[in-house]
Regions:
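Short, flexible loop segments at boundaries between secondary-structure elements
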Residues: 129-132, 194-204
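Conserved small/polar residues in nucleotide/adenosyl-binding loops
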Residues: 224-231
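Class I S-adenosyl-L-methionine
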Residues: 1-15, 20-23, 27-121, 210-212
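Glycine-rich beta-alpha junction loops
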Residues: 66-67, 102, 175-176, 196-202
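A polyampholytic, Gly/Pro-enriched intrinsically disordered region
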Residues: 78-85, 142-154, 212-221
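Class I SAM-dependent methyltransferase SAM-binding "motif I" and its flanking Rossmann-like core
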Residues: 104-165
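Short, well-ordered beta-strand core segments
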Residues: 31-32, 169, 222
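Conserved anion/nucleotide-ligand pocket segment
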Residues: 165-193
Length: 231
């Protein structure tokens, strides 16, 4: 009998924000897959091992996920990752794949999940706290009130033409484009706040667009808000 592949969110950075279910699945299963070549150096592993010290003694399966826009290279590595997971599942053991935040939000897990499912294997998703929910909590502010919409998107090329709707915008994957993002947001007149490395030891909070450094890291989450509908 084949094992089940679990995509488990470990939250944004603070190990105390990991769910009870995530902790239980890591404890109960022997094979833990982690996106990255050097598993013990990955952010997901470092978060999870603080909550589940037993993780250090588990069988760790590295799944290489390169940070590139080369579609051919991505496809090749996603396929290799899926095959490595399938080989582990064929032993009859479950595999727990650790992913930052929640596995349904810009997660590397989704790329291998589709391939593994297409080959007839069972997969299950286990929710984790998202980086943007943790960011709002860290800033002690609501993401939405009353009938305000919430927009979640990466910082893309046409950002200036996409931020004209009411509500709150969550801008993710802004690190490499931070200078451009700041220029656009500075013209908006809205409230801009950001948390870099939320919940991690090197966390930084920025309360205005002027405070945000151009070289902010990859794990930076911006909140771009309009005034409260009750104001």
């Amino acid at each position: 009998m084949r094992g089940i592949l679990y995509g488990v969110g470990v939250g944004p950075g603070d190990p105390e924000l990991m769910t009870l279910k995530a902790v239980r699945l890591i404890k109960e299963n022997d094979i833990i897959a982690v996106p990255g070549a050097e598993v013990r150096e990955t952010v997901a592993y470092k978060i999870a091992v603080q909550a589940v010290p037993e993780l250090a003694d588990k069988e760790l399966l590295p799944i290489y996920m390169p940070m590139t826009h080369d579609k051919a290279e991505l496809e090749l590595n996603h396929e290799k990752g899926a095959k490595a997971l399938e080989a582990a599942l064929d032993t009859g053991k479950n595999v727990v794949f650790l992913t930052l935040g929640d596995p349904t939000i810009y997660s590397t897990f989704s790329y291998v999940q589709k391939r593994v499912e297409a080959d007839g294997y069972e997969t299950r998703l286990v929710s984790g706290i998202t980086s943007f929910c943790a960011t709002a909590a860290r800033l002690n502010i609501p993401l939405t009130e009353w009938n305000q919409p919430l927009h979640v998107q990466p910082a893309v090329h046409r950002l200036d033409s996409e931020l004209d709707q009411p509500g709150t915008y969550v801008l993710m994957k802004s690190g490499k484009k931070m200078n451009q993002v700041k220029e656009i947001l500075a013209k908006s007149g809205r409230n801009i706040r950001m948390v870099e490395n939320c919940g991690m030891p090197d966390e930084h909070i920025y309360n205005s667009v002027e405070e945000i450094p151009d070289d902010a890291g990859y794990y930076s989450c911006l909140l771009y808000t309009s005034p409260s509908p009750r104001d």
